[in-house]
Amino acid sequence: MEFIIAEEGIPQNIGCQGALIAYYGSEIEFHYETVPLHGDEIFSAKLPLLELELPFWIYGRNLIFLDAYYLLAETVKIGTWDPITSILINIHMGKYASLDHWYNNISIEQDGLELKNDYDGQVLTLKTVDNLH
């Protein structure tokens, strides 16, 4: 298992060996589960300091850590690889919120976080996480 210290806003990609990623005093652990026909490994994830298994699987690509608390990840229901949904995870508290769509292109802008799906053109700008559930 690879050990990574994440940096804010820098996408992380992990391989089939899995990874333990540390970020601002918290950790998230990824364990390989499967790889779909199109590639890109999928992992189960756990927050070891909270002893919490996350109830979804996470693609091991384009993992983006934000602020001191959050991970933005591409997720799927356990046992599947589609449909993909972006979820914002507070890795310190074990809480998460679905963004109800898949956003594969993320950029940090002056007015917030711009999330875009390059395939269907949908765009979401997050200025705060206060209203996410």
Protein language model regions, located:
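Repeated scaffold domains used in trafficking and secretory/extracellular systems
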Residues: E2-E27, H31, P55-Y69, E74, ...
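Short, charge-rich amphipathic segments
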Residues: A22-S26, F43, L49
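Structural motif
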Residues: V35-K46, G79-I89, G121-D130
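Short loop/turn segments that connect beta-strands within beta-propeller blades
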Residues: I91-G94
